Amino acid sequence: MKDYIVRAIAADSQIRAFAAVTTETVETARQDHNTSPVATAALGRLLTAGSMMGVMMKGDKDILTLQVKGDGLIQGITVTADSKGRVKGYVGNPEVIIPANAKGKLDVSGAVGNGFLQVIKDMGLKEPYVGQVALQTGEIAEDLTYYFAASEQVPSAVGLGVLMNKDNTVRQAGGFIVQVMPFAEEETIAKLEENVQKIQSVTTLLEQGHTPESLLEQVLDGFDIEINDTIPTEFYCNCSKSRVERALISIGRKELNELIQEGKEVELNCHFCNTNYEFSVEELKEILRKCK
């Protein structure tokens, strides 16, 4: 099954909801970055959230960036998404290995540490929207739940999960974001809270064969659900040699001259997809000619 996101409303539009299966997306990230299991789980959770939060935006050129800045060994996580379901991301230390937590699970919280979650929305305005909250648990889903309530004043339930195979490939990945609208009735909120309390973990549900649609049926049990949209999602990086060339032009003539004087080819790496781009001395001279 290809990865996709569903967008839905429930309870006469008192609730809006998103759910996603992102197994291939997270596995692509794992392969690109050669991440350890705990780094895969942490990055995978944020990629899943990013894909859903990206499609919440309306504009074709809108860009969402999620940054987890913690003092743990993972050395931060960065994810960028657009409004079309395309997402990319990386961790500071992809090789991080720490002991399992008390439940015997991958210790994402321990790898992340204490710090902040930052949400940046670039919607083509003069200044991007920036919201920042302190990390609550470092488990990602709870931190986003807190962000929505504290920074956007939208009561939300966020569930995210990544399950690994024994060979460290990704077995399951996905999640949901369910949000209560300002005009929601008390009984709607109470029923939703009750559902969230009793629901099984995202990875358990995915392992049982649940789709994004049936994930929402679990979270929104007892509500009328209307699926509005189905959006493919994928790990996608828009880097290219010409984009990297533009970055080289932007460093200026002085630095470019110094690189040329060294007489060696230059290798630049894209953080998001780990692709290396090589530029020969001749190519650097050509780039220098393009500099103003």
Residue ranges and their predicted role:
Residues 197-292:
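Cys/His-clustered metal-coordination modules, chiefly Zn-binding fingers
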